[in-house]
């Protein structure tokens, strides 16, 4: 592994452990020339998974596309990068275990929406506003009503749990 500082081609592994997602190995390395320490990640090469887009075209599954959409939706929200990474890992794991060779972009979008609904309501609404391509204000109001009902249901369950 080349050193990111001096570009020397030899480094030694100082520490190695499984990352939080369980599918990645995190390694701390040290350059044998300049002694700079840096981190690398190793993961199993996945078989290509194709995403069938709404227009029928196919493209390779991209974890980064999902990550970028979620990061944009979570801007200026109290959502940590660790939370986002965990959401993306769960989505990718569900996609890879549920679908063999191809998955529709709609199925991926629905998985993202499900995860964001649990993570942060505002992030969910922001993502939905782009993903769902609302035609008018009534559709947005309907989504907000669904979220409000779900939040009220959660609060009601919490209150019932506290009184029992």
From Swiss-Prot:
Q: Which PROSITE patterns match?
A: ATP_CONE
- Cofactor binding, note field: Binds 1 zinc ion.
Q: Where in this chain does the record put each ATP-cone domain?
A: 49-139
Tell me which UniProt keywords the record has, alphabetically: ATP-binding, DNA-binding, Metal-binding, Nucleotide-binding, Repressor, Transcription, Transcription regulation, Zinc, Zinc-finger
Question: Listed GO molecular functions?
Answer: ATP binding; DNA binding; zinc ion binding
Zn finger limits (unnamed): 3-34
- The protein, known as: Transcriptional repressor NrdR
Source organism per UniProt: Streptococcus pyogenes serotype M6 (strain ATCC BAA-946 / MGAS10394)
Upper lineage is: Bacteria, Bacillati, Bacillota, Bacilli, Lactobacillales
């Amino acid at each position: 592994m080349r050193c990111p500082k001096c570009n020397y081609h030899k480094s030694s592994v100082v520490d190695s452990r499984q990352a939080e997602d369980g599918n990645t190995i995190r390694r701390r390395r040290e350059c044998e020339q300049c002694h700079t320490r840096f981190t690398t990640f190793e993961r199993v090469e996945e078989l290509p998974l194709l995403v069938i887009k709404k227009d029928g075209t196919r493209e390779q599954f991209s974890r980064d596309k999902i990550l970028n959409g979620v990061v944009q939706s979570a801007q200026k929200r109290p959502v940590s990068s660790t939370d986002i990474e965990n959401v993306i890992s769960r989505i990718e794991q569900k996609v890879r275990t549920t679908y063999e060779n191809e998955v529709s972009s709609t199925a991926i979008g629905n998985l993202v929406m499900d995860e964001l609904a649990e993570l942060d309501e505002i992030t969910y609404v922001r993502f939905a506003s782009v993903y769902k391509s609302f035609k008018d204000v009534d559709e947005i109001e309907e989504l907000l009503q669904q979220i409000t009902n779900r939040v009220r249901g959660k609060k009601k369950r919490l209150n019932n749990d506290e009184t029992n």
